[in-house]
């Protein structure tokens, strides 16, 4: 029985380590002050948080079943009902912004601030 539990635990742990989420900034329109955050995920996503630098975030669209909170540099998306974003790829959120000064727009560099669960 212990051997069976160990195998199940090891399998779950390996699957957790192999799950991945990739983000990319696309469709940047500096005149309109919008950009899309595109996501590819091989596991359901129950929430997200990321920072964007070299702009001031005004707002972000809401994935179905989620609440979104923004600060001037961070987007946080979560569900109070247990909703998840299914496996796949597509636009995660569209961000509205100001104060673009011609620099590159990039994600936060500290992995501790870019979280998916």
List each language-model region with its residue ranges.
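Bacterial N-terminal signal peptides
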Residues: 7-16
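Acidic, low-complexity intrinsically disordered segments
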Residues: 18-117
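Positively charged n-region of N-terminal signal peptides that target proteins for export
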Residues: 1-4
């Amino acid at each position: 029985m212990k051997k069976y539990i160990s195998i199940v635990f090891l399998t779950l742990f390996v699957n957790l380590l192999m799950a991945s989420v990739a983000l990319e900034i696309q469709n940047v329109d500096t005149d309109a002050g919008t950009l899309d955050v595109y996501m590819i995920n091989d596991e359901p996503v129950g929430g997200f948080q990321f920072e964007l630098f070299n702009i001031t975030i005004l707002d972000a669209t809401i994935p179905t079943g989620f609440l979104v909170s923004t600060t001037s540099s961070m987007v946080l998306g979560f569900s109070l009902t247990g909703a998840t974003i299914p496996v796949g790829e597509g636009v995660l959120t569209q961000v509205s912004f100001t104060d673009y000064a011609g620099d590159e727009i990039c994600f936060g560099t500290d992995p501790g601030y870019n979280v998916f669960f």
